[in-house]
């Protein structure tokens, strides 16, 4: 009985670990985002807006970036669930968005990307 319990706990622990967010893996996912977006203390708007302090921010509000009316008027406040839905299919979530990315479909990669982005506050400072 003790062996079965230990095996079950090991499986549960592994399953939790396998589905955890991994910021280091998310940084690798972000490589494809860098064509348009930046993060960090030297980040600036480019083809897309900078992504510092994304979570908790209202869509379409980064100063100095020209958003589509769709983004500005979406009423979206970015959180993990909204971001996950958006990044899977940006044009379905916000019809009329300027973002041309086809979408990231892999749930684990979305979680990892989220963990990476959440490290950066609005000033671009990376949490330790």
Positions of predicted regions on the chain:
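Sec/Tat signal peptide C-region and signal peptidase I cleavage site
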Residues: 14-22
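Periplasmic/extracellular electron-transfer cofactor-ligation site
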Residues: 21-66, 72-77, 88-95, 120-128
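Sec-dependent signal peptide recognition
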Residues: 1-7
């Amino acid at each position: 009985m003790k062996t079965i319990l230990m095996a079950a706990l090991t499986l549960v622990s592994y399953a939790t670990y396998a589905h955890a967010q991994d910021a280091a893996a998310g940084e690798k996912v972000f490589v494809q985002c860098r064509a348009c977006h930046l993060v960090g203390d030297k980040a600036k708007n480019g083809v897309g807006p900078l992504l510092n302090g994304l979570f908790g921010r209202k869509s379409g509000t980064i100063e100095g970036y020209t958003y589509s009316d769709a983004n500005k008027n979406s009423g979206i406040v970015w959180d993990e669930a909204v971001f996950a839905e958006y990044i899977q299919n940006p044009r379905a979530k916000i019809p009329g968005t300027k973002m041309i990315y086809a979408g990231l479909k892999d749930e684990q990669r979305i979680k990892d990307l989220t963990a990476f982005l959440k490290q950066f506050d609005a000033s671009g400072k990376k949490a330790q």
